[in-house]
Amino acid sequence: MRSALSAFNEVWQRQFRADCLSQIQALPEQSRFLIGCSGGMDSMLLLHLMSFLCPEKIRVIYIDHQLQACSHAWGEFVRAQCAALNLPFIIQKVQVAQGNLENQARSARYQAFAQHLQADEILVLAHHQQDQAETLMLRLLSGAGVHGLAAMKKFDVREDFTLWRPLLDLSREQICQWAAQLHVQNIQDLTNFDTDYDRAWSREILWPLLSDRFPKMQQALSRTSYLMQDADEILYEVLQQDLAACGSSQMLSLAALQQLSQARQRQLLSHWMKGEGQYRPSFEMVQRLFSEVIGSREDSQAALHWNGFYYLRFQQQLHRIAKAEYLPTEPIQEVAVVTCVAGQCHKLPAGHFVIQPSEVGLSPELLGQQLQIRPRLGGEKIHLYGRVGSWPLKKAIQQAQIFPWQRHTIQILSRDNVMLGVFTPQGFWLAQSEFCTQAGWQPTLSLNAKSAISDLQS
């Protein structure tokens, strides 16, 4: 390791070093670090400081957004700097989707980070105090609540990875001073000064005006973000209690929800819609959920789409349904032929079904025979085993309270036009027929099908 003492001369620099080492030592011993480096001053300083503190534990990644002609050259600059420091280096090109350029570039960048992060590896980024203050101010102007105003956390544990921002308490002036002291080379991205972008406009035009009037604004806004993080943590604890009382991540009881105050209802719905995502819905989107779905008639089947999920009311429940489940892309084959074998697992639209022995079920003579499976056509009747008489299959489905968005997955198993049973999302319904017998077999719905799957739709 190079001598680090000369890099940490001033009191605040020594304090930074002590804080970083303390945070590193608090992590599991096997923890390693992937540094996101753009080649700019902030990330190049971070690169040098981390190379002083734990060179044997770091890798470096440069994301080439391919938005500027010189982006490849910047990547080669970072590669050369890493080679001089003997640090492993990755360059990853990404395609930025159409839309808001800042948001889409950020999304592509984080997807690339997640792709390269290894087990026990923490992503390290160079956001600093002014970045934090700018983020809070921009979110305030966009109408964010407590969660949004909490801005960036120093340690951010996400679903897929953990993110560490060691420079978050350093001012822009401190970073410039330290980079000059260490003779850190860096590139200059001119888009950082392009006021067509909100953040650059804020930094170049709005920030100087406010700073002249409020010299301590940067520190004050940074402090506010920490206070908002405290408030957000307390709010999260309350929301977890409310969620447990009202339902789950996929369903809320409207009766239980309506026992809460309006403020807690609104916060719970916002938290619930966010799910495992990073961002909450807008205030207007939550209000639409109230007016268009919760306030709709029970039989209206109103649905609200946001961020890949559909939000629907079914009777006195509110459901969060993935788009793939609500709007299936693969049509169900009209008629398929299936051969059932004991222990075999079959993949159907209604779920995975395993052929298992049953005290009462279908005759073993049907095993290995060709059976037919088809979707509902409408008007079918079923004589459920153990019940008296036949009744409309539609009524049986309604009585079982199978969700409307799942009913298209229901299929009928038959032999020579004799109904043997019905595959439903709740399980297999055995039909009374000449093929029913003691010591038979039935398809059993499996919640964790690990057996070999026979796709009946192929």
Predicted region positions:
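AMP-forming adenylation/ATP pyrophosphatase catalytic core
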Residues: R2, F8, W12-G39, R59, ...
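Core alpha/beta nucleotide-donor-binding catalytic domains of modification enzymes
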Residues: R2-P208
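Proline-centered helix-kink/hinge sites
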Residues: P88, P166, P208, P215, ...
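Residue-level recognition of alpha-helical structural elements
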Residues: L101, M217-A220, S300-A302
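PAPS/PAP-binding and catalytic site of the sulfotransferase fold
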Residues: W178, S202-L210, R264-G275
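Internal, active-site/partner-interface "lid" segment
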Residues: N192-A200, Q218-Q229
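Conserved anion/nucleotide-ligand pocket segment
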Residues: I205, L209-L221
